[in-house]
Amino acid sequence: MSVRSLRWPRQKAFLAVISLVVAVLLAVPGWLTPATAASQATVQFVAPTWAAERLNNKQLKILDVRTNPLAYIEGHLPGAVNIADAAYRGPNGFLPVQIWDPEKLASLFGRAGVSNNDTVLVYSDGNDVLGATLVAYLLERSGVQNIAVLDGGYKGYKDAGLPVTKEYPRYQAARFAPKDNRAFRVDIKQVEQLTGKSTFVDPRPPALFSGEQQVFIRNGHIPGARNIPWPTFTEANNANESLKNPHKLKPLSELKAILEAKGVTPDKDVIVTCSTGREASLQYLVLKHLLKYPKVRIYEGSWTEYSASNLPVETGPDRV
């Protein structure tokens, strides 16, 4: 028997092993693997002076996402276009308040004068910062690279004595190419597979998290989730009345301590979930873009979708 004939069975066996390994890797669903690819986008929380210094920059587009149009009419940042955060969501044939498809999101951004290559500043006002953080998340999801959230919101900007106006800006609609980066989020099938493996953060009020407050089809939370109500990330409950502001973030050192006390550390695969995906957007942005946690995703369907499924529900306060 020749040397060549001896090698051939070994080569066949080696190739068979390689083929088996490749087949196994291809068979593992990609969504079971934590998202480790860094976003190309930059999301900042910027001071009012940052915004005021850039009002004449034509590459800066400003979105006022306040829900009440009269609030915008009464006064807004110069150049700001009002499109309420509620406009970005609606029914999907089964669930309410779901994010529109990429084409509709692109149309909304384009009508507001935003293109994919612009720097976009988002701000809101009122009881929470969540409208601004939701739209900032949607801009990132849609492929915008440079995004800023106005830290302190419209109130903080106005209180700083910076310029506001009642004039409506004249602008042209822009071309916004639809994009959709699925690496930033998980769906309900992924949630089912990742429960008990990933770290779920739920920023809803404790009464909703525990199931005490009966709002949904089923009430409670995803088993093992950590309850970190979103206002704890802001100055919403500052003991000094003059400093209370649900649009103003606490120092990053305090945010990091809040997370670490709940066992939410940078080595974890973190999924943020809430009622409708809106509350989750704040902690998603803070963890990913400010604290630089490498593996953070958002469950957009959140409890609206989960409560309508037959997946397990846990009640009571979290165990951490």
Swiss-Prot record:
Lineage: Bacteria, Bacillati, Cyanobacteriota, Cyanophyceae, Synechococcales
Enzyme Commission code(s) on record: 2.8.1.1
The protein's role, per its UniProt record: May be a sulfotransferase involved in the transport of sulfate. Displays very low rhodanese activity.
This protein's encoding gene: rhdA
Catalytic activity: thiosulfate + hydrogen cyanide = thiocyanate + sulfite + 2 H(+)
Name assigned to this protein: Putative thiosulfate sulfurtransferase
Induction comment: By sulfur deprivation.
Compartments reported by the entry: Periplasm
Signal peptide boundaries: 1-37
Gene3D superfamilies: Rhodanese-like domain
Species of the source: Synechococcus elongatus (strain ATCC 33912 / PCC 7942 / FACHB-805)
Residues covered by the Rhodanese domain: 56-166, 194-315
